[in-house]
Design a protein with these regions (language model features):
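Donor-sugar nucleotide-binding helix/loop cap in glycosyltransferases
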Residues: 1-206
Length: 206
């Protein structure tokens, strides 16, 4: 049986002191690894949903006309993750309310700014998956597969502003380039998810 990845080891070792950055990193990583999280992050817009609606939406996404236990179990696991972590309520990814013994899930834009290190981790994961080191914020907003805009419910404008700020605070990881009137985000060689997380935890200890 394989053990945790390098990123997983960093999260286990360093993640106890700040659960938000840990959970946002887990969410970003799951958006590449879990088909259900990827579907929920990229295909389910902000709004209010009953659990039954999400089950039906997932089955249609899978081209299955009648929802089955696979769909129900997947949604149950997703909602459990959102409920037991800061992701659902604090970060707007799916706050869960009980109404007449039924679960109502509300997905909104984050009520707080996404921490810059969590955002850079997600960008670093995109670079690792795609092999690209330069990313266009406008293209990221419209990307249905790899996008912090969709994972964290951000606009390309918000993403650009956050990355400009990140480039000032963490110039060793990220910089902004001007190309044909557009801003490009460039991730530098040290910007691995592991290095970014370690940098974050080193700084909060100071």
């Amino acid at each position: 049986k394989s053990g945790p990845t390098h990123l997983g080891k960093v999260m286990i070792l360093r993640g106890k002191s700040d659960s938000s950055i840990l959970w946002l990193t887990i969410w970003a990583n799951l958006s590449f690894r879990s088909p259900v999280v990827q579907w929920y992050a990229y295909c389910v817009p902000c709004g209010a949903y009953q659990k039954k609606e999400l089950v039906n939406m997932l089955s249609l996404y899978r081209d299955v006309l009648v929802p089955n236990r696979t769909d129900l179990n997947a949604i149950n696991a997703l909602l459990e993750t959102l409920h037991r972590s800061p992701l659902g309520e604090k970060w707007g990814l799916g706050a869960i309310f009980r109404e007449s013994n039924k679960a109502r899930i509300v997905k909104t834009a984050p009520p707080e700014k996404i921490p810059l290190h969590a955002l850079i981790v997600d960008l670093a994961l995109i670079c690792r998956e795609t092999g690209k080191t330069r990313l266009n914020p406008f293209e990221l907003q419209n990307d249905h597969q790899f996008s912090p805009c969709r994972i964290f419910q951000m606009t390309d404008n918000q993403l650009t502003k956050a990355c400009v700020q990140a480039s000032r605070l963490n110039p060793e990881f990220i910089r902004i380039l001007k190309e044909k009137g557009s801003d490009l985000i460039e991730l530098l060689p040290p910007a691995t998810p592991e290095n970014i997380l370690n940098d974050y935890y080193n700084k909060i200890k100071i």
